[in-house]
Swiss-Prot record:
Family label: Belongs to the acetokinase family.
Keyword Nucleotide-binding in annotation: yes
Keyword ATP-binding attached: yes
Subunit structure: Homodimer.
An example Gene Ontology molecular-function term: magnesium ion binding
Active site: 156 (proton donor/acceptor)
Protein name, UniProt field: Acetate kinase
PROSITE patterns the record matches: ACETATE_KINASE_1, ACETATE_KINASE_2
Sequence positions that bind substrate: 99
Amino acid sequence: MKVLILNAGSSSQKSCLYEIPDDALLSEAPQPLWEGKVNWTQDRSVAEIEVKTARGETLHESIYGDSRQAHVTYMLYTLSRGATKVIGQLSEIDVVGHRVVHGGQNYRHSVIITEEVKQAIAKLSNLAPAHNPAALEGIEAIEKSLGDVPQVAVFDTGFHATLPDAAAIYPGPFEWVEQGIRRYGFHGISHQYCSARAAQILGRDLASLRIITCHLGNGCSLAAIKNGRSIDTTMGFTPLDGLMMGSRSGAIDPGIIVHLMRQSDYSAERLDYVLNKASGLRGISGVSSDLPQVIEAITQGNYRAQLAWDMYVHRLRSGIGSMLASLGGLDVLVFTAGVGEKSAGIRQAACEAFGFLGLKLDPEKNQNKPVDIDIATADSTVRVLVIHTQEDWAIAQQCWHLLKR
């Protein structure tokens, strides 16, 4: 089975092609036959197309003009044309899987995409304005290029549909619940994959483990996982809640918003920009939303950069502590995504606060660019894993299961 994956972002569209045996799923993620990416510069009419294959062929082109959908269509054509050709024709693709950030209350599981599903994704765009419209662009590009090939939507919110009401419902008026205002949680595809991968690496039954997964990238979230299910998470109604992030504030006193909106120069649009684009590491440090650049500024004696680091660590530790309380204990702590996988300093700073649990980090393993391994000492009572998140492979697995039903 040939499975094409599209992973839409606000300024990029990533894609890859897997070949999966029809009779059984592989236990670990295979190397994709082909990987493509469209990056849009601030001038949305310019697209940087990057393609590589498992054989080592590469393509890098800049395309001017046309629509974003046309840019995605062009990227897809490189699957069956030119130096990066890996299939004879696009019709060889059996199914296309899409990461869709927000599925709302109605989409708890992966589904075959229909007109009704597309309309629901569009309707939920106000809750994920940077991602749901981009996912629709990818869906429509596939319809144009591949016709009636089955398409599957895999929702980032789906894994958190198991949250108990006490964790999911906000303590506002009950009318909010009736309006669908609740904690949805995000990064669910990553949290689910990493929890299953952790159990696989440790040779343990997933259902027997109490796991906290730390997805730390430009966006950051934690999940508390028990019996293989999400029972608590830090992101909420939108991906703005929870931890301090690259450019997002995370959780703040809502009274601050009321206070600012009473000032005539703070519109809803300005608040949306400030909280999503000008806060977090960027807002506090004044340097960047990128942690390595903040760390570089710290080495130069930048006070605000040091403050940003200290706040980031404080809120990460507090978040892990709250997830710990929801679980009633901890067997496995997982770090994943750009910061989680690459920053030994963040892992060390986070783990130092939980020595009282008997958690002991192996300094050498932590510093040695770990991938899919346990970096705790042999006598640590909590296993600490660094896992390379494989969202695309997780989506491909769900496509395989859905078509095999």
